[in-house]
Regions:
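Conserved catalytic loops of ABC-family nucleotide-binding domains
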Residues: 61-74
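Catalytic Walker B motif of ABC-type/P-loop ATPase nucleotide-binding domains
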Residues: 41-44
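Hydrophobic anchor residue at the start of the ABC signature
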Residues: 30, 58
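Conserved ABC ATPase "signature" region
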Residues: 1-11
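Conserved ABC ATPase signature
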Residues: 16-20, 24
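Helix N-cap at the start of a conserved alpha-helix in ABC-type nucleotide-binding domains
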Residues: 52-54
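Conserved catalytic motifs of ABC-family nucleotide-binding domains
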Residues: 37
Length: 114
């Protein structure tokens, strides 16, 4: 229930996938991955199809998963603002690591400017 609330998907359990918007489908897919409490969660364009409110909810849920269950979360994104919540930022260009740095100015998802 906490995960459903964080991802704003309460009430979607009884609906068919074709009845959900793209953003709702993405949030449900994220919940399906997170409910298993994985040791590693790979997220490619995690917030790509989401509005700002939903994006913040998803990022907060991922942060909670990381904090509570010590899940390693790898977020692949073109949204530089999201990197603000990372412990480590790795930039890749043309398949090669350009930089690999500890984020000394980490912020919470709610402090991000998306």
């Amino acid at each position: 229930d906490e995960l459903f609330g964080a991802l704003d998907i309460n009430g979607l359990q009884d609906r068919f996938p074709r009845e959900l918007s793209g953003g709702q489908q993405q949030r449900v897919a994220i919940a399906r991955a997170m409910v298993k409490n994985p040791k590693l969660l790979l997220c490619d364009e995690l917030t790509g199809a989401l509005d700002t409110k939903s994006s913040l909810g998803v990022l907060q849920a991922v942060q909670t998963l990381n904090d509570r269950y010590h899940t390693t979360v790898v977020i692949i994104t073109h949204n530089a603002a999201i990197s603000g919540m990372a412990d480590r930022i790795i930039q890749i260009k043309d398949g090669k690591i350009q930089s690999n740095e500890v984020n000394a100015n980490k912020v919470s998802p709610m402090e991000l400017v998306l």
